[in-house]
Amino acid sequence: LHISILIPVPRRPPPAQWAWYKWGMVDVATFLRFPDDQSAKAFAAKMPAFIRRHAGQDLGPEPAKVLSLPLLPIRQAHLQPPGGAEVGARALTVVTLGLVGILTLLIAIINYVNLATAQAGRRAREVAMRKVLGAHRAMLIRQFMGEAVSMVAVAALIGMILTEVSLPMINAAGGLSLTFPYVLAPPILVALVVIVGGLAGFYPAILLSRFPAAAVLASARAPGGGRAGTRSREILVVIQFGVAIAFMIATTVLIAQTIHVRRSDLGFRREGLMILPSMADKRMFPDQTRPILAALRRLPGVVSVGSGSAGPGDGDSNLDVIDLPGRPGLTVSNMIVGPDFFRSYAPKLLAGRVFDEAHGGDDASDWTKWKDGRNVVINRPAISALGFRSPAEAVGKTVGRTNPRTIIGVIDRLRFSSPRTPDAVTLYQYNRDVPPSAIGVIRYTGSPLDIRNAVHATWLRMAPQIPFVALTADQRLAQYYKADDQAARLFGIGAAMALLIACFGLWGLASFNTARRVKEIGIRKTLGASSADIVRLLVHQFLRPILIANLLAWPLAYGAMRTWLAGFGDAVTLSPLYFIGASGVAIFIAVLTILSQALRASRATPAWALRHD
């Protein structure tokens, strides 16, 4: 053993025995090895009983709801790292990329099926001739399936090139560092080509191979699938645009929510606020912190300088349990604050007062006296949690039996943690000196750059051995928005790709259908129809399945977005404007896509159209 320092543990605990025996920390990870998965599951099942046995007397009648000791398989640790602001962020990015890829590929498969079945009439005579020459249906199915697989193989090679080219953009949008896995790519691509080719080619192969040779060769008009074929293509267009519109709605809601959480009321004004995480450096001692705070207060433009055991961007906090008569113990977040903490953050005071130097009883820095009582400030969620009906009713009341706390004030809220977590029940206690491992906060007026330079100069003069870090509240909170920002950007890329591919397919279908209806258009114009009438006819025909697609897209997007928004403590409402706006954009782009073919068909002269074969 190489031991740097040893400190003896006294046989007799200090005066604050409750702290000696009940102080704990959960911000650690223990690595365990089990012989197999069943042993790990059996061990995890014993954890609630373990907690009840060792901590039940301190955590109330249901301790497993207060404290949990979950097991995380090491293979999941990369996507679900335990603790910190990154929890769920990596998994969300992977799920987003997977959804974008799968849904975009689905739209591309539908495109192939639609266009292949639309072109079936042109290949009907080829199929009939091959059957006359002895080809049986299985041979034709293999041929058409092979054509689909070959086309997908070519698309896969093009996709590899596009992937290599677009990876920098995807990495920038998603905050990733992906590289193309050339070693794994060949087997994965082969599997994808076979699966996608099979899915895309199966229905067209069945449709093309079933044309009867005699009927096709005897007919002057090539078969086009009839009304059933048209209906099946319309259904596929509905699915295609339903997915694309749902994509667009989801992207709109994602962007709206990320903007909302950045602008939401956190209980303090972010402008004119500077956070100093450097004060929490382990090398910073109270004797050094006091003169630094005093010097910062004297700087021009500084309104107040405060400190607290947490600040914006700190998701973790100390936990305490308040024992209430006749009720389970209440687990609360406990924050230690120094002078001018509330003046710097300026939360809304609902009732009572906040800490000040005029009331000597506010100081709770001597924990040996906590058993005799201490003054605390609580936030709004604590009112009902402690059994009070209003802020005014809570002021002056004492809660807790073994460690009584007298409520002197109630503030509205101070949200420092992730927007995905609801406001925690929080108690604030006062330390007239500097709280341990304090986060500094400066409220100022004037130029942020001038204030930062002045604070930096003061810091270098008084604490040169400790790196200076000064951030805005938004910079500290950015870690909580990162995953959703990335998801919004990736979904935006996916929505654009989905709509683009869907419009390619729609353009192809419009081209095919207008070509088949040239004679019909000529007859209509001969009977008096104008070019505008022809355009309206064709646009309405293709717009109908897109309008119906909203019936698929809206419930799908609503359910998905409602589930996603439920994970936020403060979420936007699912306004109808998101759905109407996304659908309007999709319809507008689809109309532009169709319009080129419709205008070309409407300009055809009746004489040419009637002679057209």
Walk through the language-model features, giving the residues of each.
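Small-residue-rich transmembrane alpha-helices
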Residues: P70, I74, A148-A213, A256, ...
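Alpha-helical transmembrane segments of integral membrane proteins
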Residues: A77-V87, L115-R142, G146, S150-A153, ...
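Membrane-proximal juxtamembrane linkers immediately C-terminal to transmembrane helices
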Residues: A64, A256-L276, R298, K348, ...
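Membrane-helix entry/capping segments
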Residues: I51-L103, G121-A124, S166-A191, A222-I235, ...
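Alpha-helix N-cap/start motif
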Residues: A40, A124, R137, A213, ...
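Mid-to-C-terminal secondary-structure elements
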Residues: L1-L92, R290-A483
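Interfacial "coupling" helices/loops that link adjacent transmembrane helices in transporter permeases
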Residues: A108-S150, G505-L543, Q597, A604-T605
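Generic structural signal for small/hydrophobic residues in well-ordered secondary structure
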Residues: F43, L71-A77, N111-L115, M129, ...
